[in-house]
Regions:
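Iron-sulfur-cluster electron-transfer modules
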Residues: 1-182
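Active-site-proximal helix-loop elements at catalytic-domain edges
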Residues: 14-36, 128-129, 136, 140, ...
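Ferredoxin-type iron-sulfur electron-transfer modules in oxidoreductases and energy-metabolism complexes
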Residues: 34-51, 79-81, 87, 94-101, ...
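Short acidic, glycine/serine/threonine-rich loops at helix termini
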Residues: 62-63, 67-70, 94-97, 136-141, ...
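Short loop-to-beta-strand transition segments
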Residues: 69, 124, 267-281
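Short amphipathic, charge-patterned alpha-helical segments
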Residues: 109-115, 253-271
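Short acidic beta-strand-loop surface patches of small beta-rich interaction domains
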Residues: 133, 242, 274-295
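Hydrophobic alpha-helical positions that pack around
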Residues: 136-254, 266
Length: 431
């Protein structure tokens, strides 16, 4: 096992196994809110510079430098400005933010308090998926604990449950939803830093991004920057699901490889071998065994032809139909398209129709080339990134597994790859 695998750094996951880890009492016993105490002795600009020095990058998928994002806010004019935490975790395979809030909500609340001081915000919002009522309740209970303990000062934190629309994970659609409107992506500029929630300067960050701020101030910017790679500093949560023996959350420095993470997850299930995997969830181009040793950082994964995204590492063995998996993803994106722009609204519909034909073994001559053409016409032409998310797995799937798409012209996927064989819960499966 390599040195980087050995040097796992449990910060966000530290204490997850503790008795009642979500309570304030448990969090304080683990050194909680010490970072906030330190931040309260610093000027806002100094806090921003500390985050810049740490090299922290956004964990919602884009990887934009967090401190730089905060610095885009215009000078304080004495009127409200807001922090919005994006907890609308809805993409297939992505499952790191919800467990963080469930097991350790105070690490997020402490990060919110530090960030709010940095941007001079007195009202922060956490936007949650509407389906996760239990998470909403746990977060609200933790906010109440911190408020009653006098840890938050005059900061008000509001948890808001959305209505279940995936599009509201897009930051400006989230703002529309938070304001009570139907979630639709907004035209940019103006960017949220200038005119966001209620047309006021707003910082929007992912749950993990804000939670990482806590660790930086509990330790130091230098400590954080010492982990990871030259351009992808620090550590993060890697969510491994699918055909491995022990799926779950693994907190490790950037630069760890998928081969090492699969080893940590107990390996591929017994008697099977890896076929393909996603480095950043269903919206990223798929990888195969050839990329197992690619360092999992933004630059290396990008150079290899995909995106790190939310680090949702879905693992599929040889019993899995690529066509079937991509069809399920396309059905999701077509259903979740907000309908605002033509490429996404019409394109995802036709992608789904063709994929369903291929899955059923009823593909028509020219379907594969048409599928690839539609995907390329959607990519880069939709109003937001949802269109790209639908197109990329199809383009990479055809490139890497064209023979399976060709088989869909005559043979149903269920005959080539029986459902029972790929089920984790079938006889001989993971469990």
């Amino acid at each position: 096992m390599s040195e980087i695998t050995v040097a796992l750094t449990p910060i966000l996951t530290r204490g997850w196994g503790s008795n009642r880890s979500w309570t304030l009492e448990s969090y304080l016993a683990r050194g909680g809110y010490e970072g906030l105490k330190k931040a309260n002795t610093m000027e806002p600009a100094e806090i921003v510079e500390t985050v810049k020095a740490s090299g922290l990058r956004g964990r919602g998928g884009a990887g934009f430098p967090t401190g730089l994002k905060w610095s885009f806010l215009p000078p304080d004019d004495g009127l409200p400005r807001y922090l919005v935490v994006n907890a609308d975790e809805s993409e297939p395979g992505t499952c790191k933010d919800i467990p963080t809030i469930m097991a350790n909500p105070h690490v997020l609340i402490e990060g919110i308090a530090i960030t709010s001081r940095a941007i001079n915000c007195h009202h922060a919002f956490v936007y949650l998926r509407g389906e996760v009522v239990h998470v909403y309740r746990r977060l609200m209970a933790a906010v109440k604990e911190a408020t009653e303990a006098g840890l938050l000062g005059d900061l008000r934190i509001t948890a808001h449950a959305g209505a279940g629309a995936y599009i509201c994970g897009e930051e400006t659609a989230l703002l529309d939803s938070l304001e009570g409107y139907r979630g639709h992506p907004r035209l940019k500029p103006p960017f949220p830093a200038v005119a966001g929630l209620y047309a006021r300067p707003t910082v929007i960050n992912n749950v993990e991004s804000i939670s990482q701020v806590t660790g930086i101030f509990q330790h130091s910017a230098q400590w954080y920057a010492s982990m990871g790679t030259e351009k992808s500093k620090g550590h993060g949560l890697f969510s491994i699901s699918g055909h491995v023996k022990n799926p779950g959350q693994f907190e490790a420095p950037f630069g760890i490889t998928m081969r090492e993470l699969i080893e940590l997850a107990g390996g591929i299930r017994e008697g099977h071998q890896l076929k393909f995997w996603t480095p950043g969830g269903s919206s990223t181009p798929i990888f195969t065994e050839a990329e197992l040793d690619t360092p999992l950082d933004y630059e290396s994964v990008g150079a290899a032809g995909s995106m790190l995204g939310t680090r949702a590492l879905q693992v599929f063995d040889e019993t899995t139909s690529v066509v079937r998996v991509i069809t399920r993803w396309i059905e999701f994106y077509q259903h979740e398209s907000c309908g605002k722009c033509t490429p996404c609204r019409e394109g995802t519909y036709w992608l789904k129709q063709i994929m369903l034909r291929l899955e059923a073994g009823k593909g028509q001559e020219g379907d594969i080339d048409l599928l690839d053409e539609i995907a390329h016409n959607i990519f880069g032409r939709s109003f937001c990134a949802l269109g790209d998310a639908a197109a990329t797995p199809i383009m990479s799937g055809i490139k890497k597994f064209r023979e399976e798409f060709e088989a869909g012209l005559t043979t149903p996927a269920r005959e080539l790859f029986p459902y029972e064989a790929s089920s984790n819960f079938a006889k001989g499966g993971v469990r």
